[in-house]
Amino acid sequence: MLFNLLYPLADEFQIFNLFRYITFRTGGAMVTALLISFVIGPRVIRWLKSVQGEGQPIRTDGPETHLKKKGTPTMGGLMILIAVIVSTLLWVDLANVYTWIVLLVTVGFGLIGFGDDFLKLTKRNTKGLSGRLKLAWTIAIAGVAATWYIAVTPHPLDTGLAVPFFKDLLVNLGWFFIPFAILVMVGASNAVNLTDGLDGLAIVPIMIAAATFGLIAYLSGNAIFAGYLQIHHVPGTGELAVFCGALVGAGLGFLWFNAPPAMVFMGDTGSLSMGGALGAVSVMTKHELVLAIVGGLFVLEAVSVMVQVASFKLTGKRVFRMAPIHHHFEKKGWSEPTVVIRFWIIAAILALVGLSTLKLR
């Protein structure tokens, strides 16, 4: 909004020329989202405590150390959503369609997560919305986003799949691109949701992935940098760096309240929306496969659950002591902070590996 209001006045007031730089607006979005999180955080937490009473239900079959978390409010993802949406709308070019597509996924998935959290609290169990209903709604929203993306993106980028390490390879998926994009967005959303099981565990890898894709968005949206790196140039996607900056800032603000011992949990409101947002940004920038590397920690968590379920159904035996895999390490005797910090390190390493794909071609 500031870009649309102030940049046209740059001829009269030279300082407003700053708003044409995506890097400046990305920094502004980050700081704004951080400040919003700090300001509204205590108020949101007080409100959540007043309406939730006993807080998020704690799994009785989980690690015993988690029982002390009883009474901690959930749905803290609300403060992330508010900070991201307000900051993005304030600093982004409102004429940029890719930003609106990503916001559609972010808000849509956030509403689904909110409904899930609400039912968990009112029914006093850990189930919430049925898995089928959540899946159906997330698929529908992701399908709309994918179709919208195809409609506004020039061919062959619209239905093309870029492959890391190959500079000119763009596989045309045709209409199969829609189910593929749905898989990326819904898969990322659920993978992040599964990762959100310990204090601070999910939000830092989310910030790392957001910062990484903010850089990727900036580079892919810039014809000169894209040409130098020999990655596919998608005009307009540079504005997504502003969104990613807002996500990093909001994440930092949320971490202030989510650091061990957490004052509030993210809940599905935050995890579903943030995961969906990362998936959507990867689709817009043609780096869907790179997301599997950068977000490898999320992939690991999701795969551990699938392996555990498949193994138990087929053999009656469990591969891990408990799934997702972060609980496996807790059961092995690792303290919660040890698991969290080591997983943060893994996320940072994977982000560097993902960034290396931009140059290794």
Curated annotation (Swiss-Prot):
Q: In which pathway does it act?
A: Cell wall biogenesis; peptidoglycan biosynthesis
Kindly give the InterPro entries that the UniProt entry links to this protein: Glycosyl_transferase_4, PNAcMuramoyl-5peptid_Trfase, PNAcMuramoyl-5peptid_Trfase_CS
**What is one process in the GO biological process aspect for this record?**
cell wall organization
Can you name a GO cellular component term?
plasma membrane
- The principal location of this protein is membrane
Record EC number: 2.7.8.13
Query: Which keywords does this Swiss-Prot/TrEMBL entry list?
Result: Cell cycle, Cell division, Cell inner membrane, Cell membrane, Cell shape, Cell wall biogenesis/degradation, Magnesium, Membrane, Metal-binding, Peptidoglycan synthesis, Transferase, Transmembrane, Transmembrane helix
Top enzyme class of this protein? transferase
Catalyses: UDP-N-acetyl-alpha-D-muramoyl-L-alanyl-gamma-D-glutamyl-meso-2,6-diaminopimeloyl-D-alanyl-D-alanine + di-trans,octa-cis-undecaprenyl phosphate = di-trans,octa-cis-undecaprenyl diphospho-N-acetyl-alpha-D-muramoyl-L-alanyl-D-glutamyl-meso-2,6-diaminopimeloyl-D-alanyl-D-alanine + UMP
PROSITE patterns listed in its UniProt record: MRAY_1, MRAY_2
Q: Where in the cell is it found?
A: Cell inner membrane
Q: Note the Pfam families from the entry.
A: Glycos_transf_4, MraY_sig1
One GO MF term = phospho-N-acetylmuramoyl-pentapeptide-transferase activity
Give the UniProt family note. Answer: Belongs to the glycosyltransferase 4 family. MraY subfamily.
* Official protein name in the record: Phospho-N-acetylmuramoyl-pentapeptide-transferase
